[in-house]
Amino acid sequence: MLTRSWKIILSTVFISTFLLVGLLNHQWLKETEFPQKPRQLYTVIAEYGSRLYNYQARLRMPKEQQELLKKESQTLENNFREILFLIEQIDVLKALLKDMKDGVHNHSLPVHRDAVQDQATTDVLDEEMSNLVHYVLKKFRGDQIQLADYALKSAGASVIEAGTSESYKNNKAKLYWHGIGFLNYEMPPDMILQPDVHPGKCWAFPGSQGHILIKLARKIIPTAVTMEHISEKVSPSGNISSAPKEFSVYGVMKKCEGEEIFLGQFIYNKMEATIQTFELQNEASESLLCVKLQILSNWGHPKYTCLYRFRVHGIPSDYT
């Protein structure tokens, strides 16, 4: 310990002497008319002397400050990794943009330099931008699975409440007046029949088991179903433990009140893609108008399960 103290003392004396000599030389150089290069050399030496002093100061830095410096360095490293990730994403977006440009290569924007044609140019620009926006939206909103959804509400599908579990009652989803709750605004069951898949826009039911009865837009022979949920990356809570896990699908005969036909049992894997399609294990012998979705478990949420979107695919009765 004594040896280290003497080293620090000697280093401090050396640095102080070095800086003093440098200061005297600097004053002497000012009073003489030496060439510019020796002065530049002195500046470099003085700068390195300052850096050496700072390094020695860091050696004498308290442990708390060293820990703080270490944490700041780790933060900078994390930020650097995030920047690298964003650069990779930019490359992906560039590739997508190229694909978009290829999709609209038939559209061209003429260059007008005549001031009289400015309005015409603006109109063309608006049209081109509109076409590009529509193309982009089609790219992003287009069904990745490319299968007709006969459980789509806008196409005529609906939920039969008599065959559906009760919604989860959440006190946070209630309006109050003078401390008295009078209106719930939780999402209805038919939320799962709509393509608006955003955090919070899901139908929740109590616990990990529940069911919903769906009247399809038309009679079909079901061949597959699709389950969709948000990813953990966009979840406000950072997890999707309320996502469905095991579920079964049944076809219901005779105007949604008759015999149930088992069509298959599946597992929605939250670690895989947010949109997962499952081919039915059993085929119905005739066209069906109603399908029952039975949730058997979720990914660990103790209070409720949340469904974002459920689709039903198949062959219309006109083609059977």
UniProtKB/Swiss-Prot annotation:
Task: List the InterPro entries.
Answer: SUN1-5, SUN_dom
Q: Which GO terms describe its cellular component?
A: meiotic nuclear membrane microtubule tethering complex; nuclear inner membrane
Q: How does it sit in the membrane?
A: Single-pass membrane protein
Predominant subcellular localization, coarse grouping: membrane
Residue ranges in the Nuclear topological domain are 1-6
Q: Does the keyword Membrane apply?
A: yes
The UniProt keyword set, sorted, is: Coiled coil, Membrane, Nucleus, Transmembrane, Transmembrane helix
Q: Name the coiled-coil region(s).
A: 63-102
Q: Does Membrane count among this protein's keywords?
A: yes
Perinuclear space topological domain residue ranges: 30-320
Q: Where in the cell is it found?
A: Membrane; Nucleus envelope; Nucleus inner membrane
Q: In which tissues is it expressed?
A: Specifically expressed in testis (at protein level).
Q: Which Gene3D superfamilies match?
A: Galactose-binding domain-like
Where the record annotates domain SUN, the positions are: 156-317
Transmembrane feature ranges: 7-29
Quaternary form?
Self-associates. Interacts with SYNE1 and SPAG4/SUN4. Proposed to form a spermatogenesis-specific LINC complex with SYNE1 during sperm head formation possibly implicating a SUN domain-based heterotrimer with SPAG4/SUN4 associating with SYNE1. Can interact with SYNE3; the interaction is questioned by missing colocalization in spermatids.
PANTHER family recorded for this chain? SAD1/UNC-84-LIKE PROTEIN-RELATED (PTHR12911), SUN DOMAIN-CONTAINING PROTEIN 3 (PTHR12911:SF24)
Q: What function does the entry list?
A: As a probable component of the LINC (LInker of Nucleoskeleton and Cytoskeleton) complex, involved in the connection between the nuclear lamina and the cytoskeleton. The nucleocytoplasmic interactions established by the LINC complex play an important role in the transmission of mechanical forces across the nuclear envelope and in nuclear movement and positioning. May be involved in nuclear remodeling during sperm head formation in spermatogenesis. A probable SUN3:SYNE1 LINC complex may tether spermatid nuclei to posterior cytoskeletal structures such as the manchette.
**What name is this protein filed under?**
SUN domain-containing protein 3
Organism source for this protein?
Mus musculus
